[in-house]
């Protein structure tokens, strides 16, 4: 039985919505709608034999997956934008897939850089890039040198922080599995034990609430 304690998780800075909206407003002076043909359509930041581009998420969300192992990294909801790193290597590490109903616009990376200079938005870009870097470090920290129990608890906390309408549409197991690829048997055993101990309330596979502080050890 695993005896590692649940870690005191450090959460990243809050999403800088005002900063993101400022950048989107500037970029929309040169952006064009991006046609989304179907749910889970792949959105390329670095199209083959074409200039890199910046993607603006105006409504809905993109799901971001690691290319190497198809692990879902995060659901990025509007308002949001991606591609300002300008790095082909980083762009190719992830695959961006649109959700049904997502409203996206795009502009060339070079034009986005020009607009940043024209509108003196260097601080906004730096603040947003800091947020992205912090979130990436937070996600990585969840999975490195952690036990299955610690990881399950961390993603239960993430689910708890979701808006209720989104949380009650989200399968607890699917959410954990998509982000971790942990074995079903291990995850379900932990969830069952936490339910029996009346630590969590799960109905129809969805998290209703965390009822009390989760045990430090399992």
Q: Which residues does each predicted region cover?
A:
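Cyclic nucleotide-binding regulatory module and flanking cytosolic helices
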Residues: 1-43, 50-51, 81-82, 87
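Inter-domain helical "communication" segments and dimerization helices
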Residues: 3-14, 28, 36, 106, ...
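Short beta-strand segments in beta-sandwich/barrel cores
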Residues: 34, 43-44, 60-66, 103-104
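Glycine- and acidic-residue-biased ligand/ion/polar-headgroup-sensing regions
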Residues: 50-69, 77-80
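Surface loops and adjacent helix of pleckstrin homology
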Residues: 67-69, 87, 107-109, 205, ...
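Cyclic-nucleotide recognition modules
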Residues: 72-129
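Polybasic "coupling" helices that flank or enter modular domains
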Residues: 123-182
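Phosphate-/nucleic-acid-contacting segments
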Residues: 159-218
């Amino acid at each position: 039985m695993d005896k590692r304690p649940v870690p005191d998780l450090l959460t990243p800075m809050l999403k800088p919505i005002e900063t993101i909206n400022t950048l989107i407003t500037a970029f929309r002076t040169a952006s064009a709608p991006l046609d989304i043909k179907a749910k889970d359509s792949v959105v390329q930041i670095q199209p083959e034999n074409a200039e890199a581009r910046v993607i603006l998420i105006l409504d809905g969300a993109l799901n971001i997956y690691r290319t190497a192992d198809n692990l879902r990294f995060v659901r990025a909801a509007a308002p949001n934008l991606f591609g300002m790193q300008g790095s082909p290597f980083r762009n190719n590490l992830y695959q961006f897939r649109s959700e049904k109903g997502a409203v996206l616009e795009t502009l060339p990376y070079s034009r986005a850089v020009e607009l940043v200079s024209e509108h003196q938005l260097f601080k906004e870009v730096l603040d947003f890039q800091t947020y992205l870097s912090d979130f990436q470090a937070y996600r990585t920290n969840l999975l490195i040198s952690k036990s299955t129990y610690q990881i399950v608890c961390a993603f239960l906390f993430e689910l708890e922080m979701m808006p209720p309408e989104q949380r009650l549409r989200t399968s607890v197991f699917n959410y954990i599995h998509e982000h971790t690829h942990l074995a079903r048997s291990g995850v379900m055993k932990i969830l069952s034990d936490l339910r029996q101990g009346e630590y969590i309330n799960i109905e129809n596979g969805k998290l209703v609430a965390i009822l009390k502080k989760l045990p430090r050890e399992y």
